[in-house]
Design a protein with these regions (language model features):
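Hydrophobic alpha-helical segments
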Residues: 1-192
């Protein structure tokens, strides 16, 4: 079995982490190969899952917005693995395929309102290396959102900064569930 440049061990080899795997599957609908790669270091896997759980349990911004923030940041960084995960995640939270597909044209898209455009401006800027976030991004966001909401948005971007590097560096192989979503739902709409 191979799911990264390091090869890959069977899930069965990490039976001590099975409870965590089930929680992750319950949230995502499948177990990401990135968690199998992290499972080699159980403390890393537990700590990362706890951080992700804290960020995604925010009551200040909705799950669809979180997934779109993560998608924009991942598009900006170029991580195809995370792009597939977050586009699928956005769809699972109720974001329609046309809106997901239009994310690279969000400034002109009728699918995004001005507040969402301000959020995506930051996510795309912050996803770049070097980071291109500026005071203007936050001034624009403060027209629509509280500091607490913006902090949670930045947490999503930062979390995916880690995931984008982790998965691109290890060459994580995409799982069937997000791959099927991209192939069946987004590619017919022009997704590349």
């Amino acid at each position: 079995m191979s799911y990264s440049f390091l090869g890959g061990e069977s899930r069965d080899n990490f039976s001590d982490q099975e409870d965590l795997f089930k929680v992750i599957e319950g949230f995502m609908g499948y177990l990401p190969n990135s968690h199998l790669s992290m499972a080699v270091n159980p403390q890393l896997n537990q700590s990362f899952a706890a951080l992700a759980g804290t960020i995604f349990s925010s009551q200040k911004i909705d799950q669809g917005s979180m997934q779109l923030i993560a998608l924009a940041s991942s598009l900006s960084s170029g991580c195809k693995y995370c792009q597939a995960h977050t586009s699928h995640g956005a769809h699972q939270t109720g974001v329609n395929e046309e809106k997901i597909n239009d994310i690279l044209r969000y400034q002109e898209s009728p699918h995004y309102d001005d507040s969402e455009k301000a959020v995506l401006d930051l996510a795309f800027a912050a996803g770049k290396t070097p980071n291109q976030a500026e005071q203007e991004h936050f001034d624009n966001l403060l027209e629509y959102f509280s500091k607490e909401q913006i902090t949670d948005m930045v947490a999503v971007i930062a979390l995916f900064g880690f995931l984008n590097r982790w998965n691109d560096t290890l060459g994580s192989h995409l799982e069937d569930v997000p791959n099927s979503f991209v192939e069946e739902k987004l590619k017919p709409l022009g997704w590349k």
